[in-house]
Regions:
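Residues that define the transmembrane beta-barrel architecture of outer-membrane proteins
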Residues: 27, 51-55, 101-105, 126-128, ...
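Short glycine/proline- and aromatic-enriched beta-strand/turn motifs that initiate or cap beta-hairpins
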Residues: 24-62, 208-221, 232
Length: 232
C-alpha cells in the first residue's frame, strides 16, 4: 500500500516538474502568415497615404536572436493602384491610372522595445512589445507597359503580443523605398515632367499595413531549465 502510494506521488512530482520545464521552454524560430492592405505613393498619388488601399498577404519566418533582437524574412504579394487626378497635375493635362500586382522577397532586423517573452518575469520580459524594423528587399511587378524589378529599403514599426505559449499576434506598418522608377508600369509615369533624377530621388514608394499570426518552434535549450541559458 505504502509502496504504491509513494510510487504515485513520485510520478506526480516528475510530471509536475516536466510540465514546468516545458512551460518555461523558449523557442528560436517563428513561422506564420500576414494579411492586410497595400498602398502606393508616387507620381499617381502624391499626397494621400492609404488612398487606394488594396489587399496584401504573405508568409513570414523569424529567427529570435534573443529577447530584444530578431531577424525576419518575408515573401509578400500585394496589389497597388493610382490615378492622376485632382492634385496630381501633369503637363498638357495628361491623365492616366494603373493597377498592378507586385511580389516582394525581403529581410529585416527587428528591435523590440521590451524583452519579449511570456516567461522569465524576473528578467523584465513582457508578453507585449512595440518594435522597429529596417532591412533590404527585392520587388518584382510584372505586366503593364514594362515589368518592374528593383531593390527596396523597408522601414517600419509594429507591435507583438504573445497570445499563449508558442502563439504570437502582430500588427505592422512599413514603407518601402524603391531604388528604381516605373513601379506604376506606365511609360507616362516614368518621367512625366521630362526631368532626369537619380534612383535616390525617385518618387515610387509602397507600404504595407498587416496583421500577422506566427507559431514558435525550435527549442532553444532542450535539456535544461536554467536562467543562464536564456539570452535577453
Amino acid at each position: 500500500m505504502k509502496h504504491g502510494l509513494l510510487q504515485r506521488m513520485f510520478m506526480l512530482c516528475v510530471g509536475m516538474f516536466l510540465m514546468q520545464a516545458l512551460s518555461a521552454q523558449e523557442y528560436k524560430f517563428e513561422v506564420g502568415g500576414m494579411a492586410g492592405g497595400a498602398f502606393y505613393m508616387g507620381d499617381a498619388n502624391k499626397n494621400s497615404p492609404f488612398k487606394g488601399l488594396n489587399p496584401a498577404a504573405g508568409a513570414v519566418f523569424r529567427y529570435n536572436i534573443n529577447f530584444r533582437w530578431a531577424l525576419k524574412a518575408n515573401l509578400m504579394w500585394g496589389q497597388i493602384s493610382g490615378k492622376t487626378d485632382g492634385a496630381n497635375a501633369f503637363p498638357n493635362g495628361g491623365q492616366t491610372d494603373f493597377s498592378r500586382s507586385l511580389l516582394e522577397l525581403g529581410g529585416q532586423a527587428e528591435f523590440n522595445f521590451f524583452p519579449y517573452s511570456d516567461k522569465f518575469d524576473y528578467t523584465g520580459a513582457k508578453r507585449f512589445t512595440p518594435y522597429l524594423l529596417v532591412g533590404l528587399g527585392m520587388t518584382v511587378a510584372p505586366g503593364g507597359d514594362a515589368s518592374f524589378v528593383s531593390p527596396n529599403i523597408p522601414l517600419g514599426m509594429g507591435v507583438k503580443y504573445k497570445l499563449r505559449p508558442r502563439l504570437n499576434l502582430g500588427c505592422e506598418f512599413s514603407v518601402r523605398k524603391t531604388l528604381g522608377d516605373g513601379l506604376e508600369g506606365k511609360d507616362m509615369l516614368n518621367d512625366p515632367y521630362g526631368i532626369s533624377s537619380s534612383a535616390l530621388k525617385n518618387k515610387d514608394w509602397y507600404s504595407f499595413l498587416l496583421l500577422s499570426v506566427t507559431y514558435d518552434f525550435g527549442e532553444r535549450c532542450r535539456t535544461c531549465n536554467n536562467a543562464k541559458h536564456i539570452e535577453y
